[in-house]
Amino acid sequence: MAEQDWIIIGQVVAAQGLKGEVRINPSTDFPERFEVPGQRWLQLPNQDPQSVELERGRQIPGKNLFVVKFEHIQDRTQAENIRGAKVLVRAGDRPELEADEYHVSDLIGLEVFDYNTQAKLGIVSDLYTAAQDVLEVTDANQKKHLVPFVKAIVPVVDLVENRLEVDAPPGLFEI
């Protein structure tokens, strides 16, 4: 399958314990992807995705990490062997979103324009999730700017036109 047929939902960052569990750093706002049993895919560097069965998963309290158990991973050595693997789902398995909700993968790469002047400010290069979502915008000089992803500051997101508009407070792009 082509790369656009997959959505990266996380990455295996470490083994957890001795019985084949792994820690996953998620890149999705849908925790059920790591808590509900079912088919997922693992992709090691320079390899095609391989189907795996998620047996169980749980979030580590107070951390943005999940501990999951895949069916074929039985011990710590096997768990260590998949460290660095991307965890994938098929693009067709994307959850339906409400109005003004977006998939991270749809935001990365959008062109960013000033809401008032329509001047190009840069491109969305990343999204950080914490107390509130923050867009990382990289300008033409490769300088990175952090923009709170809230309606008051980002009033326009147009996925069809591959753009968003920022009504930035003074100085946000001048720092």
Curated annotation (Swiss-Prot):
Lineage: superkingdom: Bacteria
Gene Ontology BP annotations: ribosomal small subunit biogenesis; rRNA processing
Coiled-coil stretches: none
A GO molecular-function annotation: ribosome binding
Cell location: Cytoplasm
A single Gene Ontology CC term: ribosome
Primary subcellular site in the record, as a coarse category: cytoplasm
Matching Pfam families: PRC_RimM, RimM
Domain PRC barrel: 99-172
Keyword annotations: Chaperone, Cytoplasm, Ribosome biogenesis, rRNA processing
Domain notes from UniProt: The PRC barrel domain binds ribosomal protein uS19.
Biological function: An accessory protein needed during the final step in the assembly of 30S ribosomal subunit, possibly for assembly of the head region. Essential for efficient processing of 16S rRNA. May be needed both before and after RbfA during the maturation of 16S rRNA. It has affinity for free ribosomal 30S subunits but not for 70S ribosomes.
Family: Belongs to the RimM family.
Description of how the protein assembles with itself and partners: Binds ribosomal protein uS19.
Protein name: Ribosome maturation factor RimM
Organism of derivation: Picosynechococcus sp. (strain ATCC 27264 / PCC 7002 / PR-6) (Agmenellum quadruplicatum)
Lineage, top ranks: Bacteria, Bacillati, Cyanobacteriota, Cyanophyceae, Oscillatoriophycideae
Name of the gene this protein is made from: rimM
